């Protein structure tokens, strides 16, 4: 029998949208009105190489016995009983509600693996709502956007520890460093059309596996190939070139670009191929911005380097240009390559391995605390309306990419410039080049906020 997962949560958190995305077709009716799904639907879901049965349920909601709402809840309880694991979905934009808290207890009592999915996490408000969901005690929230397909890579990583392989026994242990090293690194190679992506992979494979041509747009689909380098496995996605939206005219090409975006979301490391003779165009910057938003490690591969005239200081100039145009991922590794000639391949593969290690990094608590005290001492937060902002403490909530929550007195008053200072200082201190660093602000609860003043 197929491994079965039930999607549960209160009404209108995006359960049916997630169901449709995993099943790959619009089987469930989706609307903004709560309670659209009135019975449970089952479908065969696929997430990368994982196959399982998914059950979409009506929103968990309490109602009078015998009412439609009560029958919807009965269907949900039946789905939970049938399931091997649960997706507990919340709306990150709304944040936690009393219903979420009540039904989190309901999910815990099921005594089954639960993945907490903070849906609609795109944007600043979604990030805050996701951090708030730690209070449910269901583990680390996985930030996703079912509508836009964001966070599917993180969902895959968590799900692969729960969904058993076809023939092997289930292994629910947390992935160790040794296990991570034995698993192929997922790499997406992206860039403008005709940047040389397929030529590079063909040289890695030693065969004409991927069609190459001087004509831009030869690759229509996202194609995965297995590569081994120095005993380490890689699953590399060659993608259709990402063009400017105004130039995407054919329906087939629109689908190809969507496929490339999916490859970025499933990847752990993204290699952005730049043309040595025509680098850092607007579309390159847009692609890099997408990689940062998706929280992926970035490596810059400057292709066709063999066509450049040898001049001293070229790489240093390239480093300055990259940090100028890509301040959101300062220090991204730069590798000069020639896909056609096979030059720089070893340097590129080593850069991918190192970027992957940085992306997975967890900072020791003692070192994080020492850095935090020093960063504030060197550059205290600014005063607002004559009052100094208080930064209480910082903690790392996850890796992949390194993400932190900073507890402070007034989250809305801390300027973005100061937040950038903290990110850059952390990146430099802990050597986190080329990977997004997330710092989410959260106000520390004031225990006296709700107490009345004593009458004089």
Curated annotation (Swiss-Prot):
Which GO terms fall under molecular function for this chain's record? GTP binding
**NCBIfam families, alphabetized:** GTPase_EngA, small_GTP
Which part of the chain is the KH-like domain? 361-445
- Residue ranges of region Disordered? 162-181
Question: Is Oxidoreductase set as a keyword in this record?
Answer: no
UniProt-recorded name of the protein = GTPase Der
Which positions does UniProt annotate for GTP 1 binding?
9-16, 56-60, 119-122
The free-text function statement in the UniProt record for this protein reads: GTPase that plays an essential role in the late steps of ribosome biogenesis.
Give a single Pfam family match.
Answer: KH_dom-like
**Mind telling me which HAMAP family this protein's record contains?**
GTPase_Der
Q: Which organism is it from?
A: Bradyrhizobium sp. (strain ORS 278)
Where does the EngA-type G domain lie? 3-167, 185-360
Protein's GO biological process: ribosome biogenesis
Here the segments flagged for biased composition (Acidic residues) are 166-178
Assembly mode: Associates with the 50S ribosomal subunit.
Family under the similarity heading: Belongs to the TRAFAC class TrmE-Era-EngA-EngB-Septin-like GTPase superfamily. EngA (Der) GTPase family.
Keywords attached to this Swiss-Prot or TrEMBL record, sorted alphabetically, are: GTP-binding, Nucleotide-binding, Repeat, Ribosome biogenesis
| InterPro entries referenced in this protein's UniProt entry, alphabetically | G_ENGA, GTP-bd, GTPase_Der, KH_dom-like, KH_dom-like_a/b, P-loop_NTPase, Small_GTP-bd
* Residues noted as binding GTP 2 in the record, renumbered to the chain: 191-198, 238-242, 303-306
Kindly list any coiled-coil regions of this protein: none
